[in-house]
Amino acid sequence: AFNSGFNSIRRFNDAFQKKFARKPSLIRKLKKKSIADSVVLHLRYRPPYDWNAITEFFKSHAISRIECVENDCYHRFFLDHHNGKPAHLKVSNLPHENALKLEVFGADTRSLFWLSRKIRRMFDLESDPLLIANAFAQTPFLKKLYNKSPGLRIPCGWSPFESAIS
């Protein structure tokens, strides 16, 4: 619930029930196969968000045959956190929703929490531009830099090892 941007589990459950006309507990009880063909998550961020700068970062640091930026989307192949099998993810920007769309293909659904946290960290979605703007407003030099790129974030790699070699 908290990763989806809700302040409480009760609010999440209410929104879930309105959207899908059933309680989340009923969905959890369905126990279908744990490998999803594909799952889509919307990971919210606080605007502004400089998607072009983020994709340029990942494009310039991409590890060949593992990750790439194509058609304004970030793609990555990885070994699933739970079953060790190959999976694929795709991240695109939904600026009208202030969210990134995370599409996961072939992963065990138990890996979704881990993956969503990793993508939130990689794309710096926890950043608060208003807080940064207020802090930088105190120093004219920093204020000028911030105003040039107000949606700039600090992206990072998949792992510290990959960050070191890319």
Each model region followed by its residue ranges:
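HhH-family (HhH-GPD) DNA N-glycosylase catalytic core used in base-excision repair
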Residues: 2-166
